[in-house]
Each structure stands twice: as structure tokens, then as C-alpha cells.
């Protein structure tokens, strides 16, 4: 997958490059060169996957070839292993309303859903590059 800058489509980068940069050198945002369109049969095959397998399937579209699907699955599984529930997120019905519980991560915040995976991706991508990274996250 290649990514380009919103300010200059001639600037394009790999997943590894955008992950370590954050913003494009021209100050633009990174946009994927393509977004996979799932067929109805593909969507149907996704509906019974665990949250971890679904996350792996979707994220893999954006990080290939820099990170293969098997390695990604290990990183995603590791990220969600320390959640309080094996489902990672739970849906709870209260009367006629369905609530999505996003607080089962290690800090009890919805941000755990993304940040646990992102932390593992930084570890994996920077181990190969021998870089150190500090991630600063603010609470909502």
C-alpha cells in the first residue's frame, strides 16, 4: 500500500514511512492510495470473525507489504490479550438501545482499542529500524 499527501499527490510513501512520520513533509495528511471495497460475500465472511481477527483483516489492507498478515495477527492478538473481556468490545442491550462497551482495556478508556495496537506496531516497525519512540496520549 502506498500513501500520498493531501497537498501533493506526487509525494508518496510506504506504510512504514507514514507510520514513523505522522504528517507529510509538506504538512499534508497521508491518504491511502486505495481503499478495499468488500463484496457482499466478503462482508458476510467477516461477520462471524472475532474482534481480533476482524481488526487484523481490516488493518492488513493498509500495511502490506511492510507488515505481513501473520505478523500483524500476532501484534493485534498481543494488543488485546490484556483486555478484561475476550470479546475486546461488548455490545449490551438495555431496553431498545444497544450500547458498545469500549472500556475493557488496561486504562479503561476507549482509546485502548486503537492505542494498544498502535503501540505494538511502533514496537515492531521500530525494532527493525533500531529507533526509540515516545508516545504521549492525552485523556478525554
Predicted regions: what they are:
Residues 1-140:
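PLP-dependent amino-acid enzyme catalytic core
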Amino acid at each position: 500500500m502506498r500513501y500520498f499527501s493531501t497537498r501533493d499527490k506526487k509525494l508518496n510513501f510506504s506504510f512504514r514511512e507514514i507510520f514513523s512520520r505522522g504528517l507529510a513533509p509538506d504538512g499534508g495528511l497521508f491518504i491511502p492510495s486505495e481503499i478495499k471495497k468488500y463484496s457482499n460475500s466478503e462482508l458476510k465472511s467477516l461477520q462471524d470473525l472475532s474482534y481480533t481477527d476482524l481488526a487484523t483483516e481490516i488493518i492488513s489492507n493498509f500495511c502490506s507489504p511492510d507488515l505481513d498478515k501473520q505478523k500483524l495477527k500476532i501484534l493485534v492478538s498481543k494488543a488485546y490479550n490484556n483486555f478484561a473481556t475476550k470479546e475486546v468490545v461488548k455490545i449490551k442491550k438495555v431496553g431498545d438501545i444497544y450500547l458498545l462497551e469500549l472500556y475493557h482495556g488496561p486504562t479503561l478508556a476507549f482509546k485502548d482499542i486503537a492505542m494498544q495496537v498502535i503501540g505494538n506496531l511502533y514496537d515492531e516497525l521500530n525494532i527493525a529500524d533500531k529507533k526509540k519512540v515516545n508516545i504521549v496520549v492525552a485523556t478525554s
